[in-house]
Amino acid sequence: MRVGCDIIAISRIEKIHSRHGKNFLDKFLSPKEQILIKNPATLAGLWAAKEAASKALGVGICELCSFFDIEISKDEKNAPKLKYSQKITKDFNITQTSLSISHDNGFAIAIVAVV
């Protein structure tokens, strides 16, 4: 099992989004993922989730794992769900994933575990 974690100030993501708008969103979120955004906290949570997912692989966001190799969605209970691209799943021999996102006191944090 491998674990990745990321924490980000919600205000930091909010400022970047205010400055760059949809161009910022398009750099790391698919159109389906953009629908999940309800407020700056959820946007920061999505950023943290993708960063944590890349760190769980031990590589971070780079040429081996782009933001678009990681898909965030919701399950039937509205809990966050993580799916890697087929390439990542195969290259890193991933059989299971788990994602948790939380927001509090101006920060968003995400933790990812992969097996």
Curated annotation (Swiss-Prot):
It is an enzyme of class 2 (transferase). Mg(2+) binds at residues 6, 51. One of its GO terms (molecular function) is holo-[acyl-carrier-protein] synthase activity. It is found in: Cytoplasm. The keyword Cytoplasm applies. The keyword Nucleus does not apply. Its main location: cytoplasm. Its EC number is 2.7.8.7. GO terms for cellular component: cytoplasm. It catalyses: apo-[ACP] + CoA = holo-[ACP] + adenosine 3',5'-bisphosphate + H(+). Its cofactor is Mg(2+). Gene3D superfamilies: 4'-phosphopantetheinyl transferase domain (3.90.470.20). One of its GO terms (biological process) is fatty acid biosynthetic process. Belongs to the P-Pant transferase superfamily. AcpS family. HAMAP family: AcpS. This is Holo-[acyl-carrier-protein] synthase. It comes from Campylobacter jejuni (strain RM1221).
